Amino acid sequence: MDTAAREALSVIWKWMKLDMPVEKADCIVGFGCINDDIAIRSAELYREGYAPRILFSGGLGRNTKSRWSCSEAERYRDIALELGVPEDVILIENRSTNTGENILFSREILSAEGLADKRLLCVHKPFMERRVWAAMKNYWPEADFTMTSPRLSMEEYIEHTMAQGMTEKAVIDVIVGDVQRMEIYAEKGFQIPQPLPELVRAAFEKMVELGYTGELIG
């Protein structure tokens, strides 16, 4: 990644990441994807006493279905167990294939456990914080929740995800594609609107100009 790309991507990263205060909750919800740091961060939050339960949500999505044989949620559970989280505090949602399904299917499980009206601490990738927040407000507007993510810089996140089998360009393509999805998904009713600031729009257009188009829709 050259200097121009790094500068533009940094603008996108800072806007997509909400940096909400981490508060104690009744359940941690770890959203599945290719990056294992979400499971590690969820286990860390549990061990630090932020919540007594963890729900891992994720079947196989567009970046994991060709790489893994087990669901994202089951992979995350195994990581959490290795990190000392007791198995009996972990809930599994392993049917979802996208963020909307993550939320809807997780809500079903949490309802059955008497946790749907409790405080939730949602964990996803740093650049997914804003998109998950907007999707939660759409699919589950009454939810009491905050967003957090693994404590990684942009460069660390890219490095960690590359270590799990993606190229640098593929990782960046996903981040750029999610900026486009902020508008398209709001138009489709998948999340509440999050208008792009002009600086972010210019950064997105710069990344497209530089060829980071692999995850764009259309």
PLM regions and their residue ranges:
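A structural signal for short, hydrophobic/glycine-enriched beta-strand patches
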Residues: 1-171, 216
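A conserved mid-domain beta-alpha-beta active-site/ligand-binding segment of alpha/beta enzyme cores
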Residues: 161-218
